[in-house]
């Protein structure tokens, strides 16, 4: 399949094509982020990268099998507190127009356009008018441990040059929960918040700013005898014959604590009666009473939320990896959509 990918990011489109069992004959990608280009090129050396979509001549890709992409949703998302665009104008719309231009100039057999569900109705309607049909809404929670609701416009070229909608059924629910993808620790939720471009933290999570974290159960072991004490994760110190933990294991108050007499420190939080305290304020939480460190999700855990295969590598910093994953696609959702395109393509070949 000859692919033209706009706003390609970390090449989730290439990952999805592989997952759907579709051979990639040629893959041209438009992307300007140097870290995205470095990462996708590292994993897929065959990708040919180009620059800015605004300067592209998409007629050179005439005869492409598929155009895929999702213009940056930053300007349209409800998470955009300042200067959110709600009409079909502005920077966000200009970016979409480049995608629409790519369709018009390259005349692909199929296309997939993705964007955030939280865009305004006016923008959603304008996109649907441009394509000639309504999108399908799919929540990544069906195939992963992440709530991520996205709109997908999936089109097939007609004989008159326009496009008709390919009907996409909802994926089967795989029943994957957040606890299933954690490398360690526990969680108070069945599904993660929608992955964003930066790692979560305790403050944002507890204040419902929708960044995801995990909880690591710990035991604070204070010095006693030959035991130097310290924070003990996962395992308690040796249980003595009298049934005690050598008298020095305590559930601590939610303050900044660490090894007693040591310079190393960690934020420790106590959950008691369904509440956790952060900066003097209580928040309800569904965790067993106990003693926890709150940590951000690891890069590997975020990969699992986006159903990125374990072999995929990031030759960039974790900060950039989080950004790429947060801005990327849920691979298995795109692969699900591609299966329908694959079936339709086979029907077309059979008629020839």
Region roles according to the model:
Residues 1-352:
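Conserved active-site and SAM-binding loop architecture
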């Amino acid at each position: 399949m000859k692919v033209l990918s706009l706003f390609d990011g970390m090449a989730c489109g290439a990952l999805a094509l592989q997952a759907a069992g579709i051979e990639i004959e040629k893959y041209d990608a438009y992307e300007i982020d140097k870290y995205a280009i470095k990462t996708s090129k590292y994993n897929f050396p065959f990708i040919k990268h180009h620059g800015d979509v605004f300067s592209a001549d998409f007629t050179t890709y005439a005869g492409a099998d598929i155009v895929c992409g999702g213009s940056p949703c930053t300007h349209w998302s409800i998470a955009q507190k300042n200067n959110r665009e709600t009409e079909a104008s502005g920077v966000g719309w200009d970016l979409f127009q480049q995608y629409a231009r790519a369709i018009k100039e390259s005349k692909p057999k199929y296309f997939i356009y993705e964007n955030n569900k939280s865009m305004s109705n006016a923008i959603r309607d304008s996109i649907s008018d441009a394509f000639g049909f309504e999108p399908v809404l799919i929540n990544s929670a069906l195939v992963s441990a992440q709530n991520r609701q996205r709109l997908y416009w999936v089109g097939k070229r007609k004989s008159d040059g326009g496009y008709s909608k390919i009907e996409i059924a909802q994926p089967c629910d795989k029943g994957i929960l957040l606890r299933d993808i954690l490398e360690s620790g526990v969680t108070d939720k069945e599904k993660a918040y929608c992955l964003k471009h930066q790692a979560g933290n305790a403050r944002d999570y507890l204040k419902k700013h929708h960044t995801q974290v995990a909880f690591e159960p710990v035991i604070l072991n204070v010095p006693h005898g030959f035991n130097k004490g310290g924070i003990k994760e996962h395992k308690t110190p040796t249980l003595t014959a009298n049934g005690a933990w050598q008298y020095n294991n305590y559930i601590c108050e939610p303050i900044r604590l660490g090894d007693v007499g040591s310079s190393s420190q960690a934020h420790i939080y106590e959950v008691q009666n369904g509440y956790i305290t952060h900066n003097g304020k209580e928040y309800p939480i569904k965790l067993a009473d106990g003693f926890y460190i709150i940590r951000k999700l690891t890069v590997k855990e975020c990969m699992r939320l986006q159903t990125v295969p374990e072999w995929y590598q990031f030759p960039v910093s974790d900060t950039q990896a989080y950004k790429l994953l947060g801005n990327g696609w849920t691979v298995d959702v795109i692969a699900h959509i591609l299966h329908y395109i694959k079936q339709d393509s086979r029907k077309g070949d059979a008629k020839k």
